[in-house]
């Protein structure tokens, strides 16, 4: 089997590192570096386990894209730190001690020569979805703690799998179409697309998406298993001769405007204008700028984490 292209959900991983690694981990100058250490260590573990020859850390260049807010104004509204004047992009509420650590992580990635991928006006989910969908050569492994990305699983044209970090990296679960279909009771031949439709119907309070009132995950899965797709569900709801329960038909039809809007909000983009910070996503076996990498590692007090990353790289074929 070919070595995979690994796509890391940057924000998902450094948020989990921030909350999962003790804040007592500090740099020599006293600044917290728990997220930095956790992120680098997690990357080393993923490299050791998956043995990629290509890798990109995918970034939110816009964590709350306007096209999604225009469709559903409540989208991530509860995460806005303070409304910005004059149409400026909203700022996400982030722990004060995490923000500077994100800059540290990006400095280290840049010094090491590890590709960072982003697209103006799009979230990391869209970047991941675009890169996974357009890959035609290598199998793809998406690493994230965001269930929304289960919609990108595929078998063709290349295998796309999601390493879901819901319970942490040590207990991560690898999902492909078969696993998504089995776990959620969805049609196996379109498990990824069906998962997006399940999420749309169920809703997601963490993203400010209400879902269809009275339709939970179990009901949504049953509808998709029975009818095959969201379009067919809505066609059945609109058909007076359908066997669908009258109460359920009423709920779906009452929510038809929401369903139409949420369809574009929930599905990840697969055509985002993604660019890389490096000429290639080929994974460097040694730091591109070893002096700067060493200086940053010393300044941030993460020499041991960088050493573990290099040890993981040393196991990869040249």
UniProtKB/Swiss-Prot annotation:
Keywords: DNA-binding, Exonuclease, Hydrolase, Nuclease. Residues 194-278 form the 5'-3' exonuclease domain. InterPro entries: 5-3_exonucl_a-hlix_arch_N, 5-3_exonuclease, 5-3_exonuclease_C_sf, DNA_polI_H3TH, FEN, HhH2, PIN-like_dom_sf. GO terms for cellular component: peptidoglycan-based cell wall. CDD domains: H3TH_53EXO, PIN_53EXO. 5'-3' exonuclease acting preferentially on double-stranded DNA. This is 5'-3' exonuclease.
């Amino acid at each position: 089997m070919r070595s995979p292209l690994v796509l890391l959900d940057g924000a998902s991983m450094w948020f989990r590192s921030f909350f999962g690694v003790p804040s007592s981990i500090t740099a020599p100058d006293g600044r917290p570096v728990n997220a930095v250490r956790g992120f680098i260590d997690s990357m080393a573990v993923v490299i050791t386990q998956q043995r990629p020859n290509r890798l990109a850390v995918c970034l939110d260049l816009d964590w709350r894209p306007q096209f999604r807010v225009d469709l559903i104004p409540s989208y991530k509204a509860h995460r806005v730190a303070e409304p910005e004047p004059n149409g400026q992009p909203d700022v996400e509420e982030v722990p004060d001690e995490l923000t500077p650590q994100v800059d540290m992580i990006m400095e280290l990635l840049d010094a090491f020569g590890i590709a960072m991928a982003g697209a103006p006006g799009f979230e990391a989910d869209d970047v991941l979805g675009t890169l996974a969908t357009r890959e035609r050569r290598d199998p793809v492994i998406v690493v994230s703690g965001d269930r929304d990305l289960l919609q990108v699983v595929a078998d063709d044209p290349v295998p796309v799998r999601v390493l879901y970090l819901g319970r942490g990296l040590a207990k991560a679960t690898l999902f492909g179409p078969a696993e998504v279909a089995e776990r959620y009771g969805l049609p196996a031949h379109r498990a990824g697309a069906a998962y997006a439709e399940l999420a749309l119907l169920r809703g997601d309070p963490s993203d400010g998406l209400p879902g269809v009132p009275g339709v939970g995950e179990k009901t949504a899965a049953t509808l998709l298993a029975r009818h095959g797709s969201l379009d067919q569900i809505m066609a059945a709801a609109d058909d007076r001769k359908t066997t669908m329960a009258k109460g359920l038909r009423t709920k779906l039809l009452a929510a038809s405007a929401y369903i139409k809007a949420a369809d574009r909000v929930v599905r990840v983009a697969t055509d985002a204008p993604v660019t890389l910070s490096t000429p290639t996503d080929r994974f460097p076996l040694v730091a591109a700028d070893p002096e700067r990498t060493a200086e940053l590692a010393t300044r941030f007090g993460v020499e041991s984490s960088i050493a573990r990353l290099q040890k993981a790289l040393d196991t990869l074929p040249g």
